[in-house]
Amino acid sequence: MSKFPTVSEILSGKVAVGEEVAVRGWVRTRRDSKAGLSFLAVYDGSCFDPIQSIINNDLANYNDEVLRLTAGCSVIVTGKVVESPAEGQAVELHATHVEVVGWVEDPDTYPMAAKRHSIEYLREVAHLRPRTNLIGAVARVRHCLAQAIHRFFNEQGFYWVATPLITASDTEGAGEMFRVSTLDLENLPRTEEGKVDFSQDFFGKESFLTVSGQLNGETYACALSKVYTFGPTFRAENSNTTRHLAEFWMVEPEFAFATLADNAKLAEDMLKYVFKAVLEERKDDMQFFAKHIDKDVITRLENFIAAPFAQVDYTDAIEILLKSGKEFEFPVSWGIDLSSEHERFLAEEYFKSPVVVKNYPKDIKAFYMRLNDDGKTVAAMDVLAPGIGEIIGGSQREERLDVLDTRMVEMGLNPEDYWWYRDLRKYGTVPHSGFGLGFERLIVYVTGLQNIREVIPFPRAPRNANF
């Protein structure tokens, strides 16, 4: 064992009682007793709990330094690991030396002083908020989920591919994209028609931040069979809500020779795998969320893992909603895009389990989704989860070139702009499927937090790009 074990390694019993170690971290709290002892709670971010360090007043720097320590000071505490008589943790550290590495300049104005802060306030000091119990726990859970996703796809034989963040294609055909340009805004070049001349821009054409890695991912799926992307995506959607971010991460698998049924099975297997991982690997953080954020968060994940997914056609789901007798805020009729209240009714009240809604009307779905034989619906699916609604959206992709071209024209897109995507249908086309999972929405579901801005380190939203 290293001379500098983590707090996690010490508290989990990987360091033997009686061993001399040095703990490097930050002071959470300091408490002094009349018996001439100080109790320092030192954390290093490796786990939820700090380690208690007992410091005797015979240390050389006890009066000059130890008694001045406040929340946030960085220290190296050397001492012996001993069994703790106190409740809460099995071991503690009996200090023989305390080195102060960094002081908090003015404890009275330190934004992370040892008191409870509102979540709204923490957003204003996002550069310091990972020091709190809440955001520290979110960060560890986020890491655990990301690692579990990579592990799952690797075990399933998928290859990770890096798709570009700068693109000339709009995957969703929605037009809500951030433009990338180096043109001088005060002296824009113009065409003869008076439009901005993007041929003089850095890439020689209009370019944007990507809204999805899907189209690029499909090119590799049609060569490597099974691939996935996992990276940042961007939407210039002017939505200042608890569910939207302008910059967020997406998990997007694509696999060849796969039907919509295969797609639904992959989504179910992946979600259950990562939920199981976080419950096993981050028990301390999940217990914190269950105690302070949402008391049902652990049982919700356990129930999700245990429940087989229900499946229902969109048309049947509309019938269920119409016959429910409930008065929804958004009226129900065939052809609407299901709103959050519809999704949650289906998952929470009707099926009481995760549910895959499939075969949506073509007019409310993207051009690349496979047209069904009825000519009215496409082989699309949404996975709805109790407690949040839609958590995954996907489809079988349209592999027939003539049908794809027709769909593009119907959606007002120029097939020539997607010449490279169309090539996949010209040269050895194959049925293939995939889905998208908003990573931050997954973390919101796992932690029970109400606002997506708490689960990404530096949230980007309308009129908010600080730090």
From Swiss-Prot:
The keyword Acyltransferase does not apply. This is Asparagine--tRNA ligase. Keywords: Aminoacyl-tRNA synthetase, ATP-binding, Cytoplasm, Ligase, Nucleotide-binding, Protein biosynthesis. It comes from the Bacteria. It comes from Actinobacillus pleuropneumoniae serotype 5b (strain L20). InterPro entries: Aa-tRNA-synt_II, aa-tRNA-synth_II, aa-tRNA-synth_II/BPL/LPL, Asn-tRNA-ligase, Asp/Asn-tRNA-synth_IIb, NA-bd_OB-fold, NA-bd_OB_tRNA. The gene is asnS. GO terms for biological process: asparaginyl-tRNA aminoacylation. GO terms for molecular function: asparagine-tRNA ligase activity; ATP binding; nucleic acid binding. Its main location: cytoplasm. The keyword 4Fe-4S does not apply. It is found in: Cytoplasm. Belongs to the class-II aminoacyl-tRNA synthetase family.
